[in-house]
Swiss-Prot record:
One of its GO terms (cellular component) is plasma membrane. This is UPF0314 protein Saro_1818. Belongs to the UPF0314 family. It is a multi-pass membrane protein. The keyword Cell membrane applies. The lineage of its organism: Bacteria, Pseudomonadati, Pseudomonadota, Alphaproteobacteria, Sphingomonadales. It comes from Novosphingobium aromaticivorans (strain ATCC 700278 / DSM 12444 / CCUG 56034 / CIP 105152 / NBRC 16084 / F199).
Amino acid sequence: MNRQGVRLLPDRGGSLAAFGVGLAVVIILLGMGRPPICPCGVVRLWHGVVESAENSQQVSDWYSFSHLIHGFLFYGAAHIVWRRFGFAELSPRWALALAVLIEGSWEILENSPIIIDRYRSVTISWGYSGDSVLNSAADIGFMAAGFLFAARAPVLVTVVLGIGFELFTLWAIRDNLALNILMLVWPVEAVRVWQGGG
């Protein structure tokens, strides 16, 4: 199949592989001692209060938008790898499974003491203590949804939607994917003060 004919959507095997990788991540997180659900004992589909012990503990929150964008970006990267450069060593049906592997690896790292401590020390994390396994699994699901959306939608629609999500969360909670990465890698005190309402 030529590059123009490459399909980045998973077939049944690719979908099962993606699910299997996600399940493995859940098992690893449970083995790390992460709480299965919010320690509060309540499961909510949405929790919109950032300054709360339930943030990053429920199915979705303001940061779910960032995980959708992860999916957009991973699809874009897969598009470059398979369509432009060719990647004959690996069938494109595994692109989603590879994206889940990358996202899942981040979820494991994000819930490790070194990253939790980093968030608490350099970002406006309001006592961040890691995610519940439910939240991490949902984050992976949102990434997969973003990937599959980008695989079907026109590039311009995906780009506009991604920028819209970033601007919306910036307005709503003074945080987004770009600022999250900036503050984690290269913290800027002025940004931290602004995020705190200063």
